[in-house]
Amino acid sequence: MSIEPDISPSPDTPAPIEAKVSPMMEQYHEIKAANPGLLLFYRMGDFYELFFEDAEIAARALGITLTKRGKHKGQDIPMCGVPVERSDDYLHRLIALGHRVAVCEQTEDPAAARARKSVVRRDVVRLITPGTLTEDTLLDARANNYLLAIARARASAGADRIGLAWIDISTAEFIVTECAPAELAATLARINPNEAIVTDALYSDPELGPLLRELPAVTPLTRDVFDSATAERRLCDYFAVATMDGLSAMSRLEATAAAACVTYIDRTQLGKKPPLSPPSREATGSTMAIDPATRANLELTRTLSGERRGSLLDAIDCTVTAAGSRLLAQRLAAPLTDVEQIAQRLDAVAALLPDPGLREALRATLRAAPDMSRALARLSVGRGGPRDLAALRDGLLAADQALAQLGALEVPPKEIQTAMAALRRPSRDLAQEFSRALADDLPLMKRDGGFVREGYHDALDETRKLRDDSRLIVAAMQARYADDCGVKGLKIRHNNVLGYFVEVTAQHGDKLMAPPLNLTFIHRQTLAGQTRFTTAELGEIEAKIANAGDRALGLELEIFERLVALVQAATDDLRAAAHGFAALDVTLALAKLAVDDNYVRPEVDGSLSFAIEGGRHPVVEQALRRDGQPFIANACDLSPGPGQQSGQIWLITGPNMAGKSTFLRQNALIALLAQIGSFVPASRARIGIVDRLFSRVGAADDLARGRSTFMVEMVETAVILNQASERALVILDEIGRGTATFDGLSIAWAAIEHLHESNRCRSLFATHYHELTALSAKLPRLFNATVRVKEWHGDVVFLHEVLPGSADRSYGIQVAKLAGLPPSVITRAKSVLAKLEAQDRGQSARALAEDLPLFAVTARAAAEPSPPSEAERLIEALKALHPDELSPREALDALYALKAKLGKA
C-alpha cells in the first residue's frame, strides 16, 4: 500500500479557505495544510475528530459512523470521531493499514481561550507512521518494526546499485547494506519493513515501482531527503560527531539511504532525536539469500494464510522474552554463511544442554526481565512513563541474577561470554537509584503522579502531607487558635469567596479585634451572629493547600526527568544489556528445543556436502506428536562424489499424499536451521554452507499481475535457473504441471539438465513425470528416489519412506477416492485409465478421442451417472468379501451368487 507523498498538497487537502468560515475550521485548515498526506486527528474535548476526505477514509477503515459537522462552501463537512481514551486502538488499526496520522492536541486550557475570546490553541504533537512507532500499544512485542530507506545509483555501464538502510527506533537498531536491483526482492523479503521511504522517481520506476508497491506502506519523498552531497553532514549532525570516521564505514550509497532514514525520523518525531546505534554495515553475502517466493513457500515466519501459528518460527520459538522472540525472527530471516559464527552459536547451545536445572533457572530469570530496549526508546523520545523506568530497574536486577547463575559454567563459550559482558556494562548504581526512587505500585502515565516512593524526597513528602492531610492541619491550627484566644467556640471554615477564615460568635469578635490579638487576627467580615477573621499564617496555609497537588505533581515530574537523564547518560550500556538478554534467551530457547524435540548438532563446514540421516520436518513432526502419531524420518544425501544413495540432484517420484513435498521442505528447513546456529531435527547432519535457498513448491494465480498458476510457476523456476550457484540448495516440486503433458514433461526435462550441467547445485526435484527417471542413465549426478507406498484391497497405504528407485504409478485415482469423489467418477476414471494405458504411444490423438469419447460421457454424466459394467460389478463384489469373516455356508452361497452374476454377464 502506498501513502501520498508529503512534498505537495495531496488530494485530501481541503480547498482554499473561504471568507465565512468558523475560527475552529479555519484553524483546522491551517494545520491540515501543513501536514498533507496524513490523517489529522484533531482534538475536540474528549474526542479526536477527522474532517473532509480524512473522515471518509477513516470511517471506511475503522468501520465507524460517518456524520457531518457544519458546512464548507455550502456543502456538508464529513466528520467522524474516536474517543481519546480508546484512540490507541484506532491508531493501531489505521497504522496496520499503512496510513500515516498527525495527532493534533489542545495546547491550552479552554478557560484561557475563553478569556482571550479565541479558539483553543492546537498544535500537532506527534506524527505517527508505520515505521516510526515506539508505543507498546501500537507495536507487536515479538516483531521488529523497521523503517527502510532505499536509494539507487544509476550507472552508465548498467551496473546499477541499490543502497538500503533500515532502523527500528523502538530498539535503536540501525543497519545498512548494498545490493543489485535483481537482489532487491529477496532483500526486502528478508528485512520485511513496516514502512519504506523512496524518491518519487524510484516509486514511479517501471521495473522497481511494482515491487515497492507490494510493501505494507511506501512514502515517496523529495530528492533532497536522498541528497548524497549532504548525506554525511546529516549523519554527523544526528550522531553529534565531527566526521564519518566516528561511524561505521559505509559506501556513499549506503550513507545516502542512512541519511534519508534519520531525516525522516527527525521530521516525524518533531525534532526529538531517538538515540540510535551507529549504523552497522551488513557485508554482501554474509547471510543466506532467500527470495520472497521461497520464504512464502517454506512458511518461515508466516503460513500461506498469513498466520504465525503453524510457521517454522512458531514451531521453534521457545523464547521467554519479547526481545528474544524478535532476535530469533531476525536470525531466521537471515541465516549466516560464516562457518565460524555458526559454530560459535552452536557451541553456546551445546554448553547449556548438560544442565537442565541451570537452563530452567536462567529461563525463569529472563521471564521476569522486561523489554528494556523498547522502554529505553520510549524514554528517549519523551513518551516513556514510570513503568519504563521500572522496566530498566528490573532488567538490571535480573542481569545480576543471570550473571550469578551463569557462573556455574566453568568455561563459557564465546557467544555466552559476549552476552555476559553486555549484562555487566550498566552501572548498578542506576538500579539502586531507581529502587530507592520508584514506588511499588506505578501508574501508566507520569502525569498521574504517585510514582515516587515516600521518603525519597523531603520536599515532596512535605507537599504530599500538606495535600493529603489538609483537614488535620486546619484542625490542629483551629485548636491552637482557640487556646490562644481562650474562645472554645472558635472555628476555621472555608468558602469560595473568602477561602479559609476564622469564625467566632459576635460576642467574641470584639476580643479578637482588641490588642494584642488584633496583631494576629485580621477582621474580614461581620454578620448578624458571627465575626470572621483571617491570619497571615492561615493565608500561607491556604496557598500551600491550594497548590499542594500541583506542586506535588511538579516535584514528581522533576524527579522523573532527572531519572530519565540518568538513563540517557547510560543509553549505550543499557542497550548492550538488553541485547545480551535477547541473545541469551535465544540460546536457551534453542537448547530447550534441542532437548524437547531430540535435535542434534549439525556439522557445518565450507564443503558442498549435504548429508542428512533421520531427517524430520520440524513443524509437521510437532503437529503429528500432538495427535499422538510418529513422524517417519528419512535420509537425504546430496553430497558430491560416488555413493549408492548420493547424487547432487535427487529426482523423487511417487503419488500425491505420500510425503514428497514434506521431504523437500524438511531438508530445506534443516539447512536453514543449521545456519542460524540451531540444532536440527535429524539423527546426523553434515551441511556445506548454502549461500542461496530456492524453493518452487506450490503455486497459485497472481491475478493482480495477470499471471496464471503456470506463469507464476515458470517465473519462479526462471529465477532459480538464472541465479542458483553451486552453493545453492534448490527444491522443485511438480515443475511443468498446468500445461499440456508433453509441454510440461519437456520443460521439466530441460530444467533438470540445466540444473545438472549449468547450475551444478544441490537439488531435490519431485515429479509425476516418471519418464524423467530415465535421465539418471545419462546424468551421473542424478539419483532416483521414490516414496514408498503399499496397496491393500485396492486402496493405497502411504508409508512415507523415501527409498532408492522410481515409482511406476501415481495412484491418483486412489488418492481421489480418499478425497471422497463420487463412486461413479472413480469407476469411470479407472475405466479411462485402463484404456489409456493400453494405447500405443504412437496412436494418434484422433484415434484416442474416438476410442474414448470423453465429451459424450461428460454430457451423459451431467444427466445421470454412467453405471458400472458387469465386470466392474463383479470386481467390486469380490473386493467386498472378507473370507476370514464368513462361515463355510456363507462362503458357498457367496460363490454361487458370483457364478450366477458371471453367467448373466
Curated annotation (Swiss-Prot):
Gene Ontology terms: biological process: mismatch repair
Example of a GO cellular component annotation carried by this entry: cytosol
Pfam family, one: MutS_V
Binding site for ATP: G654, P655, N656, M657, A658, G659, K660, S661
Stored PROSITE patterns: DNA_MISMATCH_REPAIR_2
Similarity field: Belongs to the DNA mismatch repair MutS family.
GO molecular function: ATP binding; ATP-dependent DNA damage sensor activity; damaged DNA binding; mismatched DNA binding
Region annotation Disordered: where it falls in the sequence: 272-292
Gene3D superfamilies reported for this sequence: 1.10.1420.10, 6.10.140.430, DNA repair protein MutS, domain I, MutS, connector domain, P-loop containing nucleotide triphosphate hydrolases
Name of this protein: DNA mismatch repair protein MutS
CDD domains: ABC_MutS1 (cd03284)
Record keywords: ATP-binding, DNA damage, DNA repair, DNA-binding, Nucleotide-binding
